[in-house]
Design a protein with these regions (language model features):
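Surface-exposed interfaces of beta-sheet-rich extracellular modules
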Residues: 1-20
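Extracellular/surface recognition and adhesion modules
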Residues: 1, 31, 57-60, 119
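C-terminal beta-strand-rich structural cap/linker in extracellular carbohydrate-active enzymes
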Residues: 21-36
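Feature responds to low-complexity, polar/acidic, surface-exposed segments characteristic
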Residues: 9-11, 34-54, 62-63, 67-115, ...
């Protein structure tokens, strides 16, 4: 704001509302606007609001369930390991104290150590049966569904629903331990088949 001689007027105020003492002359007011970055924006360069998974990524990031693979990457297409999955569930539970079973291939210094111990102690995972958990192994669909099935049961969620999975051409290849979990997951809409009928 300037008076008719071009002298700047003193502005007072805050929060977008400003005042000045009106001089005995015409006043020229020029307003300039600056765009600010969306404070709600995620820090990841590989996740945009147009992505179908944006809201889910925002939720897990805002709630400290997942943090991404680096400061600016979430890596949404990265395959998930067994250690990652139990860590997600562990954080979802508020990272409770964990003690009990320790697998021979889970080093206490690893980020997933407490999560694996907690998951095993609560019957969410049981490992491979040879004393190993395989934390860095990529998790398969049937393993993931089995983990979620046991996690839901542990939370007191009704897991009695079943749907026939025999319509899928590869249903015969589902491991025996995972059949009930797959039937439950299909019944509740957690999974569906692929376009090729598998």
């Amino acid at each position: 704001a300037t008076d008719s001689r071009g002298n700047e007027l003193t502005l007072t105020g805050q929060d977008g509302r400003f005042e000045f003492i009106m001089p005995a002359s015409d006043v020229t007011v020029n307003a300039y606007f600056t765009a600010f970055e969306d404070a709600e924006r995620l820090p990841f360069t590989d996740v945009s609001k147009a992505d179908w998974f944006y809201d889910a990524v925002k939720y897990v990031y805002d709630n400290n369930i997942m943090s991404g693979t680096s400061g600016d990457l979430f890596s949404p297409d990265l395959q998930t390991t067994r250690g990652m999955i139990v860590t997600i569930l562990y954080r979802l539970e508020g990272q409770p104290k964990a003690s009990g079973i320790l697998f021979s291939d889970v080093e206490q210094s690893m980020y997933y150590a407490d999560a694996v111990t907690w998951a095993a102690a609560n019957g969410v995972v049981s490992g491979y049966g040879n004393g190993e958990f395989g934390p860095d192994d990529m998790i398969t669909r049937e393993q993931l569904v089995s983990v979620l099935y046991r996690y839901a049961a542990n939370k007191g969620i009704d897991v009695s629903g079943r749907a026939d999975i025999k319509q899928f051409s590869d249903a015969y290849s589902v491991s025996g331990y995972a059949v009930e979990a797959m039937e439950w997951a299909y019944a509740c809409g957690l999974i569906s088949g692929m376009q090729d009928g598998t």
